[in-house]
């Protein structure tokens, strides 16, 4: 009957082993790509969301170095979302500027057509 305590110890050890978070290397890569993409579309250090993303990415790297993988994953995920938000805001600003430019041209054309009649 000594098998039961040994079996329980093995099961407990297996559960503890599964509870450890793996290193979030893939998430860090995704986050780095998201930051690079936001920068590529025109986000700068003046964009608060990009600054937040970079700060969280730096913290995620520090957490990785300390082997605090759960914290690293959470920081990296948040940084990725912040970078994507910065990218979306920059693209929205560019789109709004293009719409305003088209509206200005349309107004000029309307005036020209009205003056020609």
Protein language model regions, located:
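Bacterial N-terminal signal peptides that target proteins for export
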Residues: 1-7
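C-terminal motif of bacterial Sec signal peptides marking the signal peptidase cleavage site
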Residues: 14-17
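Bacterial signal peptide processing site
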Residues: 19-22
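Juxtamembrane extracytosolic/periplasmic "stalk" immediately C-terminal to the first targeting helix
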Residues: 27-35
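Post-signal-peptide N-terminal segment of Sec-exported extracytoplasmic proteins
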Residues: 36-78
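A contiguous, mid-protein "functional segment" used to position or interact
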Residues: 66-96
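Surface-exposed, polar helix/loop patches in the mature regions of secreted/periplasmic/lumenal proteins
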Residues: 85-117
């Amino acid at each position: 009957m000594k098998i039961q305590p040994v079996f329980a110890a093995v099961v407990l050890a297996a559960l503890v082993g599964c509870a450890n978070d793996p290193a979030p290397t893939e998430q860090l890569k995704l986050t780095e790509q998201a930051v690079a993409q936001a920068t590529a579309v025109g986000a700068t250090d003046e964009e608060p969301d990009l600054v937040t993303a970079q700060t969280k990415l730096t913290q995620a790297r520090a957490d990785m170095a300390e082997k605090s993988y759960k914290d690293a994953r959470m920081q990296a995920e948040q940084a990725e979302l912040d970078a994507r938000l910065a990218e979306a805001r920059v693209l929205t600003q560019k789109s709004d500027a293009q719409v305003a430019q088209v509206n200005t041209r349309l107004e000029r054309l309307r005036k020209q057509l009205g003056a020609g009649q």
